[in-house]
């Protein structure tokens, strides 16, 4: 694995290898808290968009591996404001670092970065396109909290149009046998047809507007992403259309996930019920990103 740009680029066996390595990283975290696999190495985090969990978990992962971090979170302090191209930025920074993690508002920015980098590039989210490291930590959460990925029944609820985490996860799940997916969203926020076409025939799909979480293993809630709407009035038409409460969950044997941040789509009272795993899901970002960084670096020096 040279870069991690899209879930389309990696197969089932590579996914399972990353999940196995993530389990080893979690064990290290629990036993010692750190290791020296990437001692003396540098990760560059280039965040052209705001981030809390992804950026901080990448930085934590690199430091837990014994490495160091450079980067930026505010492009107003960079040469981007002078008109420097993304390609030139990557060519320069890949000379300073051993790995690069980039988040960018433009679809395809991570791919372009990988084409201009001397070191492995990790897509930390490119517009509404892909978010592969989130997908891998989602799969790890499912494996750890549900116990299986094959024959999984999962309901995605909310913004399925702009939600890059949903796009990536659906594509990854299509590699596993017996998966059934419910896509629950308003018409304005349906899953893009190209994603549907990509996974059609590989998994059982059903689309609906009304919430139906009976007979599922996982409920995957998503935020309605105001920042992706061209017309803010369209956002307010769908804002708050789905809100998960304790009453919805009841005694169901289900795992509730959310890529976070949350706005109003999950009541805060849900946080304290045993089915809620979204904060555990967020924690898993550290061992999973440790595994990704370690494996990418090892492959780059072979």
UniProtKB/Swiss-Prot annotation:
Q: What is the similarity comment for this entry?
A: Belongs to the aspartate/ornithine carbamoyltransferase superfamily. ATCase family.
Q: Where does carbamoyl phosphate bind?
A: 53-54, 103, 131, 134, 260-261
Assembly, in brief, is: Heterooligomer of catalytic and regulatory chains.
The molecule here is called Aspartate carbamoyltransferase catalytic subunit
Keywords attached to this Swiss-Prot or TrEMBL record, sorted alphabetically, are: Pyrimidine biosynthesis, Transferase
Lineage of the organism: Archaea, Methanobacteriati, Methanobacteriota, Methanomada group, Methanococci
Q: What is its EC number?
A: 2.1.3.2
What InterPro entries does this protein's entry cite? Asp/Orn_carbamoyltranf_P-bd, Asp/Orn_carbamoylTrfase, Asp/Orn_carbamoylTrfase_sf, Asp_carbamoyltransf, Asp_carbamoyltransf_Asp/Orn-bd
Instruction: Write out the GO MF terms.
Output: amino acid binding; aspartate carbamoyltransferase activity
Q: A Pfam family name for this chain?
A: OTCace
Query: What organism does the record attribute this protein to?
Result: Methanococcus maripaludis (strain DSM 14266 / JCM 13030 / NBRC 101832 / S2 / LL)
Functional pathway:
Pyrimidine metabolism; UMP biosynthesis via de novo pathway; (S)-dihydroorotate from bicarbonate: step 2/3
Q: Note the NCBIfam families from the entry.
A: asp_carb_tr, PRK00856.1
Please name the top-level EC class of this enzyme.
transferase
Q: Which residues bind L-aspartate?
A: 82, 164, 223
What biological process terms from GO does the record include? 'de novo' pyrimidine nucleobase biosynthetic process; 'de novo' UMP biosynthetic process; amino acid metabolic process
Taxonomically, which superkingdom? Archaea
**Enzymatic reactions:** carbamoyl phosphate + L-aspartate = N-carbamoyl-L-aspartate + phosphate + H(+)
Question: What is the role of the protein in this entry?
Answer: Catalyzes the condensation of carbamoyl phosphate and aspartate to form carbamoyl aspartate and inorganic phosphate, the committed step in the de novo pyrimidine nucleotide biosynthesis pathway.
What HAMAP family does the database record attribute to this sequence?
Answer: Asp_carb_tr
């Amino acid at each position: 694995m040279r870069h991690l740009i899209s879930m389309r680029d990696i197969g089932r066996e590579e996914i399972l290898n990353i999940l196995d390595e993530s389990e080893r990283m979690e064990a290290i975290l629990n036993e010692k808290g750190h290791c020296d696999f990437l001692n003396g190495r540098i990760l560059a985090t280039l965040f052209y968009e705001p981030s809390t969990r992804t950026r901080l978990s990448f930085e934590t992962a690199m430091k837990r591996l014994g490495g160091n971090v450079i980067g930026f979170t505010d492009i107003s302090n960079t040469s981007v404001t002078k008109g420097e191209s993304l390609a030139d930025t990557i060519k320069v920074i890949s000379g300073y670092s051993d790995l690069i993690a980039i988040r960018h508002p433009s679809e395809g920015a991570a791919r372009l970065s990988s084409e201009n980098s001397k070191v492995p590039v990790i897509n930390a989210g490119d517009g509404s396109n892909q978010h592969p490291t989130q997908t891998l930590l989602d799969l790890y959460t499912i494996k750890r909290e549900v116990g299986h990925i094959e024959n999984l029944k999962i309901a995605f609820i909310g913004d399925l149009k702009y939600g890059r985490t949903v796009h990536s996860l659906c594509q990854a799940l299509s590699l596993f046998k017996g998966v059934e997916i419910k896509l629950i969203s308003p018409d304005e926020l349906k899953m893009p047809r190209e994603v549907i076409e990509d996974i059609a025939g590989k998994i059982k799909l059903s689309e609906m507007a009304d919430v139906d979480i009976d007979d599922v293993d996982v409920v995957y809630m998503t935020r309605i992403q105001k920042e992706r709407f061209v017309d803010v009035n369209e956002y307010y038409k769908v804002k708050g259309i789905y809100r998960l409460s304790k009453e919805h969950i009841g005694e169901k044997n289900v795992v509730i996930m959310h890529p976070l941040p949350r706005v109003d789509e999950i009541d805060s009272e849900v946080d304290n019920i045993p089915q809620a795993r979204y904060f555990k899901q967020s924690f898993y970002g550290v061992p999973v990103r440790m595994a990704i960084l370690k494996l990418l670096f090892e492959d780059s020096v072979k």
